[in-house]
Amino acid sequence: MKTKIVKQTTTKKKMVIHSFFSALVLLSLFVSPSLSAQNSKSDKFKENYELKEVVVLSRHNIRAPLSGKNSILGKITTHEWTNWTANASELTLRGGVLETMMGQYFRKWLEDEGLFKEGYCPNTDEVNIYANSMQRTVATAEYFQSGFSPTCNRNFYHRFTPSKMDPLFFPRLTKVSEEFKAQALKEISAMGGTKGIVGINESLKASYDLIERVTDMKNSPACKEGNTCALNDYNTQLTFKLGDEPNMAGSLKIANTIADALILQYFEEPDDKKAAFGNDLTVKDWENISKIKDVYGDVLFAAPIVATNVAHPLLVYLKDELNSNARKFTFLVGHDSNICSVTNALQFEEYSLPNTIEKKTPIGSKLVFEKWQDKRTKKEYISVNLVYQTTDQLRKLLLLNLDNPPASFQMKISGLTANEFGLYNFDDVVGRFDQAITAYEAIK
């Protein structure tokens, strides 16, 4: 399918990107290397294993907030939000620049590992790039591909004209019953300990207080209209509707909308004080704001029975890609909800990412399944890493290369044993996919 139906004018934006890169070359000279699992393989590892395939589930890159300035977002503060370079929910210019750099890095890494020869244009059997049909995901795939294979004149796939959710990426519930609802609420309540849902909100009180202060909520138009003056509704109401995403009402939802916009503004606005509406915020403060987003995502998509339900189409697709003989590289572009539900359905261990204010699914982050083969025995293994641009790389538009890679965090799968190199037996990982797929079939 042709990919010229991106609402932003791709060719126009690419011209601007070239001017960005000419300036960014100088910046790369001053960047200290960050830890990357892809780039830190030991000589012993390289002597024994060769890379055979990579399957990536990516979150889109930086977008404008989902809500416009005339929504609750514009009324909840006395301050003016930044002037976004895109319409609500769409990929920003900065997001395009950053994703192009990610595409360039991934190509250099795969060439360095011998998966592709330098300058080689892979065929459609070898490379599969597939995006959800929202503008921000289609544009992310376009920019990634322009960095990954700039001279190959390749098309990538998206099912619908933007913007519409593709069932593969739509984290909707396809099985709902009273039994399912009861189990989902039980698992979600457990996240808050003995106080359940209220306990979840109480754990965020410091974050709520911070957002109220930063936005000057008590003096906002929303407060004056008698709507929202404080984030004090701790009785989050959850709804599970067949064919729709899990949803909620209460302060956690409102706080997530604000936190999402603040974090995106922090990435877009280079002036720290302007990004914080004139406040002096520390990195820890930004982490506390971002924590709201992490908890919000966990409440909606991390409960085992919910994750298994909403991630089912992606689990089937990812498993098929990992088992494809011809495929060398798969790049799927979706959302943070996709990464959250897939990692929880597969029972990944709890984690907190370093060098980023977003500790779970940073903007533009990629869940990377690497298939390695033992050169001697031909036995196959899987390594899983979460690859992401650090907060500094995002805010300073730092160039990526093999000497200055994005951050890479090695993920662990609960109940599976990795070898000394962090590799899992291929059959064990496929078995975990089968377990999650079977668990979906058991949902009533």
Please provide the spans of the model-predicted regions.
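N-terminal secretory signal peptides that target proteins for export/translocation
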Residues: 1-17
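N-terminal leader/targeting signatures
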Residues: 16-17, 26, 41
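Short beta-strand/loop turn elements enriched in aromatics
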Residues: 19-20, 66
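Bacterial N-terminal signal peptides
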Residues: 21-32
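Sec/Tat signal peptide C-region and signal peptidase I cleavage site
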Residues: 33-37
